[in-house]
């Protein structure tokens, strides 16, 4: 509904009506009365057009007009309006929202009610139905069909299934509803045709009393059929709203499950499900160790219970700190990935822009070369050519400079990585040299009795220098000089016999 124009939509069977001109004092009874009056006006116009058509093709004195065809399904204009045949007290407006419905009292301010729904207005529908096709109470109810029993022939089998329509297919239900519409339209046409004839007849009172009973029977049948049609269409609206609500709930459930899954992946890793199962299996295996006796298990439980609570609190605090650091690490990792993606995207955009500019400049340069030179250009033409040449050289230099800058950054990153690898190898080599020196001091004899501390001080430094010189010699020598193995480590160790006398002499 548009609040500026004060309009509201009301469904009548399968047709949507827009009621305009509403005010804050408009009630549901006013809307029902307006809709019934509109239906009466439309029926009068249809009857008038039918009479004008029948006047052009008159029937015989005892000939009745042809009944409507049973297979005619295109009479959509007359069907909804032909069913509104009764006083306003026989109709009511039902409010439907997400599969629930309630009967609106006649004194309800419908415009105020519509404004109170707020954001849920798109899920609310107002349906005009007969009062017999809805529940007597005004509370909300779910989509449960009600069976309207016949007053002439009550149902003999009370124990019959309450919902035989559930076993029917959708196409069969559609055919039943269409047949009910056609039958209702046929009864309405017969009643409209018999009304003028009954007013102009001058038969006796006995004949009029005999003809009134079938007319009453037909009117009751029309009312029951109209009630049934309104009930079916009301349930159709309710079912459609429930199906829409189910789709919305499915989308919300999928969104929540995806959010929970991503949260768990962020906290516990990608394979958190597999890790959970493995942890559970490990606990079960630990709990069912075959070689452990119940007494030992009880003793371990008592020791765990007798442990001081401070250890448990410290462990819990350590776990919390570890979890916090893990969360921080994950957050930093995500930020790093985002920054890398942004950097790659910007680099690709810059490269694409440079390529486009280069190609544009190149095309302009080729086009300028292909154009013939004007003989009367004079110094202006030469100046333009010189300016174009300088601009082309400048763009070329800019492009080449940017490419060289990119290559320089790549070389710098490779150089930093190589420097880091060299530092790590250097530290590893120094650690190996220190370990080897310690082993040599352990294996060597304790030394001469007259040796003192000043004579032992230059020993490690001299050994370290010697091993560095040997390592440099191995690095300079090719792989063909290594006779023991391919790595060269065995040749390094093969020089132990040469280095031991020097160490011993220094000691």
From Swiss-Prot:
Occurrences of domain Ras-associating (ranges): 4-133
Residue ranges of the region described as Disordered: 46-80, 185-222, 444-507
Subcellular location per the Swiss-Prot or TrEMBL entry: Cytoplasm, Cytosol; Cytoplasm, Cytoskeleton, Microtubule organizing center, Centrosome; Cytoplasm, Cytoskeleton, Spindle pole
Keywords linked to the UniProt accession: Coiled coil, Cytoplasm, Cytoskeleton, Neurogenesis
Transmembrane segments: none
GO terms, biological process: nervous system development; positive regulation of neural precursor cell proliferation; positive regulation of neurogenesis; signal transduction
Skewed-composition ranges (Acidic residues): 68-78
Coiled-coil annotated residue ranges, if any: 237-264, 319-358
Tissue expression summary: Expressed in brain. Tends to be down-regulated in astrocytic gliomas due to promoter methylation. Methylation occurs early in gliomagenesis and the extent of methylation parallels with higher glioma grades, so that methylation is observed in close to 70% WHO grade IV primary glioblastomas, but not in grade I astrocytomas.
Gene assigned in the entry: RASSF10
Domain of life: Eukaryota
Main location: cytoplasm
Polar residues bias (residue ranges): 487-498
Stretches with biased composition (Low complexity): 197-213, 447-460
Keyword Cytoplasm on entry: yes
Free-text function comment from the UniProt entry: Plays an important role in regulating embryonic neurogenesis.
GO terms for cellular component: centrosome; cytosol; spindle pole
Organism encoding this protein: Homo sapiens
UniProt-listed Pfam families: RASSF8-10_RA (PF21712)
UniProt name for this protein: Ras association domain-containing protein 10
PANTHER family named among the record's database cross-references: RAS ASSOCIATION DOMAIN-CONTAINING PROTEIN 10, RAS-ASSOCIATING DOMAIN CONTAINING PROTEIN
